[in-house]
A protein has these predicted regions:
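Alpha-helical bundle/repeat cores within regulatory domains of eukaryotic proteins
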Residues: 189-274
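Catalytic and GAP-homology cores of small GTPase regulators
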Residues: 81-198
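Amphipathic alpha-helical protein-protein interaction segments
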Residues: 42, 46, 50-53, 57, ...
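Short secondary-structure junctions and interdomain/linker hinges
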Residues: 75-78, 96-99, 124, 128, ...
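Short linear, low-complexity motifs centered on an aromatic residue
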Residues: 1-5, 9-10, 14, 130-142, ...
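Short acidic/histidine-centered micro-motifs embedded in hydrophobic/aromatic stretches
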Residues: 19, 30, 70, 112, ...
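Acidic, serine/threonine-rich, charge-biased low-complexity segments
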Residues: 1-107, 113, 272-274
């Protein structure tokens, strides 16, 4: 009787295990379908909103041309340029029926609209002083390149804690900064910097049992900025400060402060060691 009872229980346990395995497989399939549907929904939103943006911008062409004219006018102040862009963005969004839009769709709408608009005025906004700005960026780029040749992660100049050496040279963070020039809007550029710092924080956290502090992040970020040596870094900082600084919040603002501090530290090094 005991043997029969044991076999019966054993069969039941096997049945439960197989049922559990079957349910887990089904849950995985359902999750995969949900993710696929979400991607399809996001793609559909992007296509529809992109079409709406192109349609409404065609009607705003006169206003866009006026914006371009004011950006070319040397008497237009920097703060005024930022206000002009924001007013045109807000005015254009007001032309659309956005009451039925979700918060996610409204965010996407503004991002797409920003990309279209900033693409039209990018060089005027990014290099307000034309060749002078480009020359200044080029000189700094060359100086950082020389500095990078003899700089390693264990340099006393940076004083990076040895416990973080195992994750150097932080290639994923460098790769993010190298993409900076590919983006045209200040929002997209700051997101690029945000991802760079996030990569560093994640890698540093694997080297210790606590969350890395600003004192941990900054020296590594300095190293990453030097080694990536992204072009037009000074113009990037001024561009973001002009057109996006007031919209930053939370971690985004924190990482931006760290990035600017890293660049200032590099400029100090170069000034002390010309």
């Amino acid at each position: 009787m005991i043997e029969i009872d044991w076999k019966t229980r054993n069969f039941y346990i096997i049945y439960l295990l197989k049922s559990r395995q079957y349910l887990l497989q089904r849950l995985k399939q359902i999750d995969s379908v949900q993710q696929s549907l979400h991607k399809d929904h996001s793609s559909t939103d992007f296509i529809i909103i992109s079409f709406l943006v192109r349609s409404i911008l065609e009607k705003q062409e006169q206003n866009i041309q006026e914006l371009i004219r004011k950006f070319r006018d040397s008497t237009t102040l920097t703060d005024e340029k930022a206000s002009l862009v924001q007013r045109l963005l807000d005015h254009t969004i007001d032309q659309l029926q956005t009451k039925l839009f979700t918060d996610e769709q409204l965010t996407l709408l503004r991002q797409i609209l920003e990309r279209h608009l900033m693409n039209r005025i990018y060089l005027l906004a990014f290099y307000p002083n034309g060749d002078i700005d480009q020359l200044r960026d080029q000189i700094l780029h060359q100086q950082i390149n020389q500095l990078s040749l003899n700089l390693s992660h264990n340099s006393k100049l940076l004083n990076i804690p040895t416990k973080f050496f195992t994750t150097s040279p932080w290639p994923s963070a460098q790769a993010e900064l190298l993409l900076l020039s590919a983006y045209k809007t200040p929002r997209d550029k700051i997101q690029c910097i945000y991802r760079c710092c996030s990569h560093i924080m994640t890698l540093l956290s694997t080297s210790q049992n606590s969350i890395p502090s600003a004192d941990d992040l900054l020296p590594v970020l300095i190293f990453v900025v030097i080694k990536s040596n992204t072009r037009s870094i000074l113009s990037t900082i001024e561009y973001i400060n002009t057109f996006y600084l007031n919209e930053m919040t939370g971690e985004q603002s924190y990482y931006w402060t760290q990035f600017c501090s890293a660049v200032e530290f590099i400029k100090t090094i170069l000034h002390c060691n010309p």
